Amino acid sequence: MNSQTALQYVKESGVVAGMRGAFPPDVALQVSAVMMGEGINCFEFMMNSEAPIEAMQAVKAEYGDDACVGMGTVLDVATAERVLDAGADFIVSPAFQPDVVKAVLARDVLMGPGVATPSEAVHAWNMGVRLLKLFPIGALGIDYFKAMF
């Protein structure tokens, strides 16, 4: 799935279901089946161990292009490349790291870097990023979000 298609999935779904933890593939398939049944077809696994890669691959194999399946908490280029090689449709990071952004965009995959300032947001946008993660939104608050955008 290319970056434009993945972005369209995210826009149309309106929700990206985040799956944090060391989900074994069978549990990830059970959770994603419930979500798919409710019309949620975008899933973000969190890269906090090796288990999320296997879970992501299982969900991707089960649903193919009927779901948009990606990985969050990607912190460096080496991890981004491993996740991309495993078939991620998108990557999200809690930080704006230009080297990670370049590596992901070079493979025409949707990238959502974390941004906390207008300068980071504009820099990411000028690099070709079309999905931004305002992070940490909980600490910054909705008023900060409104003022920024």
Q: What are the language-model segments listed below?
A:
Residues 1, 116-130:
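Alpha/beta catalytic cores of nucleotide-metabolism and tRNA/nucleoside-modifying enzymes
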Residues 1-86, 106:
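Conserved N-terminal beta1-alpha1 strand-loop-helix module at the mouth
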Residues 19-24, 71-77, 93-97, 113-118, ...:
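Glycine-rich beta-to-alpha transition loops that act as phosphate-gripper elements at the mouths
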Residues 41, 89, 130:
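Short acidic/polar active-site loop segments enriched in Thr and Asp
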Residues 51, 91-92:
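Canonical helix-turn-helix DNA-binding module
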Residues 55, 78-79, 99-100, 119-121, ...:
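Short acidic active-site motifs
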Residues 98-99, 106, 126-149:
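Active-site/ligand-binding-proximal alpha/beta "capping" segment
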